[in-house]
Swiss-Prot record:
This is Probable D-serine dehydratase. SUPFAM superfamilies: Tryptophan synthase beta subunit-like PLP-dependent enzymes (SSF53686). Its cofactor is pyridoxal 5'-phosphate. GO terms for molecular function: D-serine ammonia-lyase activity; hydro-lyase activity; pyridoxal phosphate binding. Coiled coil: none annotated. The modification N6-(pyridoxal phosphate)lysine is found at K111. The keyword Lyase applies. Keywords: Lyase, Pyridoxal phosphate. Belongs to the serine/threonine dehydratase family. DsdA subfamily. It catalyses: D-serine = pyruvate + NH4(+). Pfam families: PALP. Its EC number is 4.3.1.18. One of its GO terms (biological process) is D-serine catabolic process.
Length: 445
């Protein structure tokens, strides 16, 4: 049987994916009922409340967070220069913004949202269980000597391609937990080095993301007092990401950009295993319902969420099942199989997915530098082609027509997910590669 034949994928879509051709896929399942295990409004409120009551603790632990009072928040940057430079004429419609999670302090990526939330939830639980904190206790007590001594008896473990490991590792080690990060072959050397300087134990694996996660999960299962942060199924991570929705809503209101039937919001999100975009989409849908249209961006070598959403929902699928190799410069997105939790929720809520090849990643990275003054890592540039896909492709225009959307009234938010902690020499290497690529032929949108 040919590779991919048993996945219930449309033959034309399968051929496009197997040829590594950048593709826009529209989700026919959008609007279906949410699964029974979907988070509740109370779950979302609890996550937001946790990050707020722990803000003072975070500000005490990390000087970088003191200007925000310990709140995990990033700016919303207008992207008109990027819009003007878009090559497809229709792609210039609406208002464009970049959500700058690339500059989130301490972790330097979107993973601060989910990772910090999970570690804080664990720390609160342990502290309350041992009488070190109560419901009304100032959470700065979690940085006390007594709390650190208690946390030191516990291990926090995670499997990662890099950025989630940084997020978990930085906070867990700062609180006094023994911290172990299993890192895949895709993880960058500087990320491993940064963790080790904080006393984090880094376990390197020759295999991909899934193998690193599985190794961590198996090790944690045999250890007492060990908490495994499961990027493939953690509700705490998911809810931490979802808190970004209220932050974005406040920023859009301040910018005078309403979100309603006449003024839809399009959000374009880089996607690896699916937890971060899934959580953000879930939070935005809770606020805006059908007026938000979310598209996830994946490498052509690693479209694990697209494969899962477009295929049979009942069976987990991998990009290896359709003959792809999961090899991409977008190390943070090099994931072969989607999170079952995130995929089930995105199936009901995502508008679609698009893929981007490595040449496009570097072209977008250079556009971000030259047009907006933003230095990104390659995976963080994955979603920059989103507005052009929507307004400049046949499928995108059909999506707009089918919903009676006026492109000029839309707001597009492109999520930039990481880059501020990348060493300067790495940024220079990325940009030199992108400029050399441009000289020998450039890349599409």
């Amino acid at each position: 049987m040919p590779v991919g034949r048993s996945l219930s994928l449309d033959p034309n879509l399968l051929a496009q994916l197997q040829s590594h051709s950048p593709t826009l896929w529209l989700n026919p399942h959008q609007g279906m009922p949410l699964p029974d295990f979907a988070p509740t409004a109370a779950d979302l409120a609890d996550a937001d409340a946790r990050l707020r009551r722990c803000a003072g603790l975070l500000a005490e632990l990390f000087a970088e967070l003191r200007p925000s009072g310990g709140l995990i928040a990033s700016p919303l940057q207008p992207a008109e220069p990027l819009k003007r430079a878009a090559r497809a004429g229709h792609a210039q419609a609406g208002a464009w913004y970049v959500k700058r999670d690339d500059v989130l302090p301490v972790a330097g990526s979107i993973k601060a949202r989910g990772g910090f939330h999970e570690v804080l939830a664990l720390a609160e639980s342990i502290a309350e269980r041992h009488g070190l904190a109560g419901a009304d206790t100032d959470r700065r007590a979690l940085a006390s000597g007594a709390a650190r001594a208690r946390f030191a008896r516990h291990t926090v473990m995670v499997g990662s391609t890099g950025n989630l490991g940084l997020s978990i590792g930085m906070l867990a080690s700062a609180l006094g937990f023994r911290t172990v990060v299993h890192m895949s072959a895709d993880a960058k050397a500087w990320k491993k080095a940064r963790l080790r300087t904080r006393g984090v134990e880094v376990v390197e694996h020759a295999g991909d993301y899934a193998k690193a996660v599985d190794a961590g999960r198996r090790q944690a299962a045999g250890m007492p007092c060990c908490h495994f942060v499961d990027d493939e199924g953690s509700r705490m991570l998911f809810l931490g990401y979802a808190t970004a929705a209220a932050e974005l809503a406040a920023q859009l209101a301040q910018a005078g950009r309403p979100v309603d039937a006449r003024h839809p919001l399009f959000v374009h999100l880089p996607c690896g295993v699916g937890g971060a975009p899934g959580g953000i989409v879930y939070g935005l849908k809770a606020l805006y319902g059908e007026h938000v249209h979310a598209f996830v961006a994946e490498p052509t070598a690693s479209p694990c969420v697209l494969v899962q959403l477009a295929g049979d929902a009942a069976h987990p699928r991998s990009v290896y099942d359709i003959g792809l190799d999961n090899r991409t410069e977008a190390d943070g997105l090099a994931v072969a199989q989607a999170s079952p939790l995130a995929a089930a929720l995105l199936r009901a809520q995502a508008a679609g997915a698009f893929t981007v090849d490595d040449r496009q990643l570097f072209a977008h990275l250079l556009d971000a530098r030259e047009r907006l003054g933003i230095d990104l890592e390659p995976s963080a540039a994955a979603a920059f082609g989103g507005p052009a896909w929507i307004a400049g492709s046949d499928a995108g225009r059909a999506y707009l027509r089918g919903r009676g959307i006026d492109p000029d009234a839309a707001t597009h938010v492109i999520w930039a997910t990481g880059g501020s902690l990348v060493p300067a020499q790495e940024h220079r290497r990325f940009q030199a590669h992108a400029r050399a690529q441009r000289q020998v032929g450039g890349a599409g949108a």
